[in-house]
């Protein structure tokens, strides 16, 4: 199975198909899901009970301690440490504040849920009948199983396995976070990205200015290789260009733009 497959690769937080632990053949179903999960992870567990626990939601467990909650607790810290070490080594020019913002974006529930669904872990979950009957459950459920699986990998295979897998799975999320959450100099980041990925240099255009001379507001827009991006307002042209660059970076990564272009701030 291709580890990049997903029920919907464009939205990792869509409704997910769940495995009902109360089906007529729950054991056989769970075994099939465990095997599929190992294929996704590219790793054969020595302790299959550990992996089953990682995939089991509290609603599908015989008792609370048989669910993935304890593994989720450990996986959260393993994920955080691994990403922190990665960022610390890869981005020596970034400040503590920038690294913190990047890390927070990478390990967020949304990011983890999206990656888990791209991998196909949403097809490996084991839950109770009530969850599947209601068809209503928190979207954080998939990010929880992602953290639990990380913990299971850590226990069964060690930190190297976790480090290798996370660098493969989270590379896109790290690049996105670096480009949108990192250095406050968005113009510099946009220029580096545009030259590296698009072989082009951004240009900025004044679209509109408003207000009295002592309190003017400027609307600037960024353009890269003839593609125009959402403009942004600023108290001066330099500030507006920085914000326009931030909007461009967000659009280039299919993310929500951080600055409004409809009207100048009050």
UniProtKB/Swiss-Prot annotation:
Give the EC number(s) listed in the UniProt record. 3.1.26.3
Describe the reaction catalysed, as an equation.
Endonucleolytic cleavage to 5'-phosphomonoester
Q: Which GO terms describe its biological process?
A: mRNA processing; regulation of gene expression; RNA processing; rRNA processing; tRNA processing
Q: Which Gene Ontology terms of cellular component type are present?
A: cytosol
Give the main EC class: hydrolase
Species assigned in the record: Rhodopirellula baltica (strain DSM 10527 / NCIMB 13988 / SH1)
Recall the GO molecular function terms of this protein's record.
double-stranded RNA binding; metal ion binding; ribonuclease III activity; rRNA binding
Which keywords belong to this entry?
A: Cytoplasm, Endonuclease, Hydrolase, Magnesium, Metal-binding, mRNA processing, Nuclease, RNA-binding, rRNA processing, rRNA-binding, tRNA processing
List ligand-binding residues for Mg(2+). 72, 144, 147
Q: Where is the active site?
A: 76, 147
Compartments in which it is found: Cytoplasm
**What is the name attached to this protein's record?**
Ribonuclease 3
Q: Name one Pfam family in it.
A: dsrm
